[in-house]
């Protein structure tokens, strides 16, 4: 043990410190800071005592008045008494500071001379980092910092006071923590008051020593936090739960950005002026600050105007050039250059600058119109800038227009391109030069990125003046440029993407459209089939022809991005050495270097490899090269006596033990995988059995082949394979030991065996073995030994049989094995025969087999038996796919590049934070037993899906004492529940995974500090994984309670028995796990089962802490709120409260999850915090690499060190259904290849809710790890990434470590998740963060940002719009007669449309989603497997799923931008193999998919019936197949991917349930699941809260349904070919008549149907007669025919739907007219019945078709079938007998 771990004598009775000083014993969190003499492992570190002592240096500071000063008070108490901080806030931050300062001092290299005092450099670095944002804020506002410390005269006590003051403010700021500059303002003023106290200033008013403006109990909370909190709460209340338009209330960002201007000093003052308009929520309040969010698609243009300018200008230029191209026989490039040489073309190309200036004007007008509310008396400059921007843009348009007009005017005058005309062109170009000056300057700064950063980050007013015009003043978004190398990398990427895109667009999109456009443009005398409003002009037709082409043109960069990012991602992955070890076979080849890899990467090395500099990096690279490919002696072989081998054995066996505890390997597999201890005098390293399989047989065959070869040559051949050499030596040594063990020591037989092995050893040493013994006889000896070991291995074997085999072996060895036959006399002389052979049979009474309780002996025998008998390759060990994957990934990761691991003492400390609300903790007995309607229970499902793991679990339980399986429900119920919970998405699974960090750190701390002797003795003592029952280690220290063997704690391990005590303290100092269980207090009060299970988790995991919000009644109907931290005290055997910090009010003002995280954030510790969601998991072997990952913070990635470390994820929910597999594959490619490319080379990786590791203090002072404003921050986690990038952070991605993640597995769950993400992206479009990133990032990073965030969803929506534009355009051309006249035979048009249809189809099929999957599979699993997986996906209808998902994303993204309505959607995390009813599917998908699909299907039918192209079936199919595929996918996907989706009986029941739902007359409390009417009203909620613009756009979009009527009525026979407008107007009489009839029927039903039913029937009869008479009259007196009735349905049903949708938008005033509104509701019900029947018809038909249900089940569960699972039993509900 090192000097660092000086032990403290154990205490007896009351702590010494408590006796001496009288400090009351308080529960502590990690270290008892108030009692430094306690017997606690952490207090053995001198750094802890030094940090605590530093806080005690109050010295001569002026004491606070009015309170009694106690001797044990420290600097934080001093601050609290002066400024009125809460006691528990002080206690919390005291521990926080002590832990951080101690950990920081531990990392000092070299260590300070005096380890018992705190180094001043540690405090200084901490202060600089923590207050960096404050210093930047002061500089930005031009205020002098109130940190009065100079580097020349360091003052550690003053530094500690500043740090302590900031942390105390932050710890009590509650919701204000989301507003970092607000906290800066508070700190600035309080630091000023602190300085006055420290400088002994006098109060100007009283002449007394200066006192803070606020002091006393809870003064800070009530005087500072509460007023600002109340303001936030008032704004939230005004927002009506976020439903009011964003522009009408202030969110967190608005209030925070108020502190970005110096008006906060003049308006707010200090102490806070509560009369300031800042605090007013109504009337003349401050209003929006910094940015105004408005619901409009124009914000996509505002935020990314540079992208749209680029696309618009190229499209314009391409059309101009292509229009002027002269088709000839030359190449396409020659035609292009010839067109460009023409002066007319060159001049027309100048019009792009008119367009550009027009787009600038649009941008300026949008800025002014949307941001006008920001204008106030204090922001006059902002108003002036917006106004001048509009004027300047308008001036440029006028200037360019005049100059351009002059060019053509001069040319027309001169009738040629004269010199005068050329002069006019030059004048235009001079203006262009002036116009482009800002762009040229931007380009120059792009090439020199450090100059741009300098200009933006420098707060000199001259630079503000220079940049004021181009970008508004903003505290964030400055200095975002990357280094030159990164700049070149991502620029090159985008140059290739854009070059490909524009080449493709010109030659395959624009150019083919020119000829048909010219034909249509010049077409005259079109035979229109309706009333034409535009005369003979075909401009509208041309526009419709171009619309789908333009839409695809605008979005197809997304396709090219997907292609290039896949290629680049694969290249980066290859250089990162991903996928080099893909399976157990490849691991087998590298396993001998594996120990060295663990030593190199996971064990700290005392060498200069960590030092900076090119030389050391080069040495490190050489070391890694040797390691990766086994070059050089150090990485070649391990001998059994090496400490390195023993450390490796301890780590490897601990990993295998973790696998066994998780039941992913069996007991037998543990024996095959473990590295056993060095026993039985084996002289080589004892590799795991799965590596030695078949090696002995191969060695024997080599010996047989080389029968005449000398010893040296034979041994050389065997030693070429390390495993073979070890197998031979171990088998020989083990057989020798076995024979000598089972034969009694004092017998002649023992002596004979000893002599025989001496002879063999002598022959080996003298290299005479092949000359002494018959090598050809070895197989016979081998077979005999096999029998012998087999008999010994059988614990019930009769010793007589063993004697017989030994006698046979003796005969072979003595009579046949020697080359020179020996006589009996020679054998006797050599001691190989008994002295009196005739007295007894040899071995008769000499055998003594060890007792069956000798587990170690028989374990070694089993191993020997395995080495002797294994003839297969054992590639199937372990059997479990998850175990194989984890071993392969872990082993591969150790050959990847990663920082070296420091000692645990010197590593960065970190926390894990998990937000939890009310999800499952542990499955209850009832949940496991309850069955679905198909008779399937959760446990049965898990037994079926995880059959091998269930078998392993039962094996473990039987080993622990159960006799029958029924005992699992009694004595082992807890184990059973945990086993099931670990296979769901439960909190128990997450906690188990995270606590592996603690277990790993304890083991690594032991290995760090253990001496060579400790390691060797430990390996001898343990060596193998003997303790499979998981008893808890280290209990002598009193930190882990005595628990049963089924403990959920992961502290249990074989290595833990070697711990010396300090490992626990070290691990606790470095790791804390906080679960933010927001409502745990109320769950306890209500005695909910979740509370009991959470307590159980705390009981089993000593590093686990629970943070919750406690609501305490305060009288008068008021409630006090507290942030509380609790733990389980194993000595008191109860839950104890550690800290209780009072809050200003309810936590949840904004979005729930970030508010939950924020309140618990004050209880986290360390330099980093990892955000883990409730559906995530981790693994022991991955936890070993955490300290390597944290070292990344010390390395530069580009020009900055990281602030977020991205971590790879493994999706663990894709193992059964094809749907789960599709989602898993999509997510896997996103979280691996996608994130890899975003981080390198694109440098735009954000935080997407992954298990990323945050630089805790960096984020602590910059707003936290998420944003919480209501609705706008619905995707709360991604805003942490936005905020990080905007504030100059750096996000990286690391794939040598991974965690598990669960995903939704049912279509409805997946759809809700997609809806949530799409809605979140819709809100992001409106946000200030996206706007600032769109403007502040350089051009190429802006492109990366757009196409990987909101652009992806926008482009998905564009694909859907393309389908609409294409089909509506074709219908227009068909119904108008234009298609018949001009385009029916236009092959050019079809070619152009074919290109865009193909592109649309590529996206629709999910191919651009699938491409990254294929590439990632190729990289990590192999190319052939990737192709096979892709083919399987297509066979299993993945294209249907991706097309359906595309519709979900497009619907919710578009609707959120237009109307809002984004909300958290609970997707559920259960196991989905149950059938979902038709009603549920209809409710979920009616508006997002079904209605749209029916509309598109109707368009296709109308087009087919009226288009001349439809007569050519091949052309029609080619043009509409993609659209029909979309229609079918949107209608059928919910049934294709629904278990038993085509079961006839279920279909019948579903339809009955649907009709009941439609006609259900609900009450007030009715839910939408019960009543159609309730659901129908809920579906309109977004229209209730939308603005006038949203309603206007909605009505405009609805007008398309009236086009059906306009187009079709002219096709009716009754129209008689007339094209008069009156035909259309008369058709409305039909609509009006139907509506009147409907009102009459409704009136009659309401009045007569109940009491006078005969009258109701009479009215119906009269109306039917009237209708018949009208039809007869029409047949008699007009050209009406019966076919018109059916044709008119295609016209009038869409019209009715359109009227209905418009009525919904006018619901507010229509509801005042009850009869009309009731009619609207009734009509809506009829339409939903119609839609339901239309959807049900194909489902019913397929259900009726024989064999289709079986085929659907096979498609949906093919993955399970291929694994041999009993999936049919799950689907059909037929259990097999004997299931638990």
Swiss-Prot record:
<dbReference type="GO" id="GO:0008360">
    <property type="term" value="P:regulation of cell shape"/>
</dbReference>
<dbReference type="GO" id="GO:0005886">
    <property type="term" value="C:plasma membrane"/>
</dbReference>
<dbReference type="GO" id="GO:0006952">
    <property type="term" value="P:defense response"/>
</dbReference>
<keyword id="KW-0133">Cell shape</keyword>
<feature type="transmembrane region" description="Helical">
    <location>
        <begin position="1395"/>
        <end position="1415"/>
    </location>
</feature>
<dbReference type="GO" id="GO:0000148">
    <property type="term" value="C:1,3-beta-D-glucan synthase complex"/>
</dbReference>
<feature type="transmembrane region" description="Helical">
    <location>
        <begin position="387"/>
        <end position="407"/>
    </location>
</feature>
<feature type="topological domain" description="Extracellular">
    <location>
        <begin position="1443"/>
        <end position="1489"/>
    </location>
</feature>
<feature type="topological domain" description="Extracellular">
    <location>
        <begin position="1642"/>
        <end position="1657"/>
    </location>
</feature>
<feature type="topological domain" description="Extracellular">
    <location>
        <begin position="408"/>
        <end position="427"/>
    </location>
</feature>
<dbReference type="GO" id="GO:0050832">
    <property type="term" value="P:defense response to fungus"/>
</dbReference>
<dbReference type="Pfam" id="PF02364">
    <property type="entry name" value="Glucan_synthase"/>
</dbReference>
<dbReference type="GO" id="GO:0009863">
    <property type="term" value="P:salicylic acid mediated signaling pathway"/>
</dbReference>
<keyword id="KW-0961">Cell wall biogenesis/degradation</keyword>
<feature type="glycosylation site" description="N-linked (GlcNAc...) asparagine">
    <location>
        <position position="1712"/>
    </location>
</feature>
<dbReference type="GO" id="GO:0052542">
    <property type="term" value="P:defense response by callose deposition"/>
</dbReference>
<dbReference type="GO" id="GO:0009555">
    <property type="term" value="P:pollen development"/>
</dbReference>
<dbReference type="GO" id="GO:0009620">
    <property type="term" value="P:response to fungus"/>
</dbReference>
<feature type="topological domain" description="Cytoplasmic">
    <location>
        <begin position="564"/>
        <end position="1348"/>
    </location>
</feature>
<dbReference type="Pfam" id="PF14288">
    <property type="entry name" value="FKS1_dom1"/>
</dbReference>
<keyword id="KW-0812">Transmembrane</keyword>
<feature type="transmembrane region" description="Helical">
    <location>
        <begin position="1589"/>
        <end position="1609"/>
    </location>
</feature>
<comment type="function">
    <text>Involved in sporophytic and gametophytic development. Required for normal leaf development. During pollen formation, required for the formation of the callose wall separating the tetraspores of the tetrad (interstitial wall), but not for the callose wall surrounding the pollen mother cells (peripheral wall). Functionally redudant to CALS11 (GSL1). May play a role later in pollen grain maturation. Required for callose formation induced by wounding and pathogen attack. May interfere with salicylic acid-induced signaling pathway during defense response.</text>
</comment>
<keyword id="KW-1133">Transmembrane helix</keyword>
<dbReference type="GO" id="GO:0003843">
    <property type="term" value="F:1,3-beta-D-glucan synthase activity"/>
</dbReference>
<comment type="similarity">
    <text>Belongs to the glycosyltransferase 48 family.</text>
</comment>
<feature type="transmembrane region" description="Helical">
    <location>
        <begin position="1621"/>
        <end position="1641"/>
    </location>
</feature>
<dbReference type="InterPro" id="IPR026899">
    <property type="entry name" value="FKS1-like_dom1"/>
</dbReference>
<feature type="topological domain" description="Extracellular">
    <location>
        <begin position="1538"/>
        <end position="1588"/>
    </location>
</feature>
<feature type="topological domain" description="Cytoplasmic">
    <location>
        <begin position="1"/>
        <end position="302"/>
    </location>
</feature>
<feature type="transmembrane region" description="Helical">
    <location>
        <begin position="543"/>
        <end position="563"/>
    </location>
</feature>
<feature type="topological domain" description="Cytoplasmic">
    <location>
        <begin position="1511"/>
        <end position="1516"/>
    </location>
</feature>
<feature type="topological domain" description="Cytoplasmic">
    <location>
        <begin position="1679"/>
        <end position="1681"/>
    </location>
</feature>
<dbReference type="GO" id="GO:0052544">
    <property type="term" value="P:defense response by callose deposition in cell wall"/>
</dbReference>
<feature type="transmembrane region" description="Helical">
    <location>
        <begin position="1422"/>
        <end position="1442"/>
    </location>
</feature>
<keyword id="KW-0472">Membrane</keyword>
<feature type="transmembrane region" description="Helical">
    <location>
        <begin position="1658"/>
        <end position="1678"/>
    </location>
</feature>
<feature type="topological domain" description="Cytoplasmic">
    <location>
        <begin position="1750"/>
        <end position="1780"/>
    </location>
</feature>
<feature type="transmembrane region" description="Helical">
    <location>
        <begin position="1682"/>
        <end position="1702"/>
    </location>
</feature>
<keyword id="KW-0328">Glycosyltransferase</keyword>
<dbReference type="GO" id="GO:0002758">
    <property type="term" value="P:innate immune response-activating signaling pathway"/>
</dbReference>
<feature type="transmembrane region" description="Helical">
    <location>
        <begin position="490"/>
        <end position="510"/>
    </location>
</feature>
